[in-house]
A protein has these predicted regions:
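Short, small-residue-biased leader/transition segments that mark boundaries at the very start
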Residues: 1-3
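Anionic-ligand-binding alpha/beta catalytic cores of soluble enzymes and soluble regulatory domains
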Residues: 8, 13-61
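Phosphate/ribose-recognition catalytic cores of enzymes acting on nucleotide-derived substrates
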Residues: 5, 48-159
């Protein structure tokens, strides 16, 4: 058995939960993923939402995120899987308040590419691959849809 007598560090920077939180909350996802040596992820139960994504052509799985230290609000390239599965599906996620719809509560909404099916009450693991952009309030739903299409192209190119 090996017992470490010094804190873990990389390039003279001590890796701590405080440092990881700081990086997460400032949008430095690449740093977090490097320090963890894996993709930062959230596991949660899919809950029924207001169906806003579905109404505008981008159905989402709304993930319960209470009890998590969260990343900077914004749009992310992600991949997700059911907890007991090994098959990941790429997608895009909005972590935030949905300012175009005057949202008050922070939500994680995940749109999975080439997926159809019912995920309600299933548990998903969502791995965050890349920060795409900060959350923004759009003047109308058409502007939001136009931006989502641009974000989808970026997310699909993410490895």
């Amino acid at each position: 058995m090996c017992i470490r007598d010094r804190p873990l560090s990389i390039k003279k920077k001590i890796i701590s939960s405080s440092l990881l939180r700081k990086y997460l909350q400032s949008g430095r996802l690449n740093n977090v993923n490097k320090l963890l040596n894996r993709k930062w992820s959230i596991d949660g139960k899919v809950q029924k939402g207001r169906q806003l994504g579905k109404k505008i052509g981008f159905p989402t799985a709304n993930i319960d995120i209470k009890n998590y230290v969260l990343a900077k609000p914004g749009v992310y390239a992600v991949k997700a899987k059911k907890i007991k599965s090994s098959k990941y599906i790429k997608g895009i996620a909005n972590l935030g308040y949905r300012p175009t719809f005057n949202g008050k509560k922070i939500l994680l909404e995940v749109h999975l590419f080439n997926f159809s099916g019912n995920l309600y009450n299933k548990y998903l693991r969502v791995e965050f691959l890349k920060f795409i952009r900060a959350e923004k309030k759009f003047k109308n739903v058409d502007q939001l849809k136009k931006q989502i299409k641009i974000d989808l192209v970026t997310a699909k190119k993410t490895k």
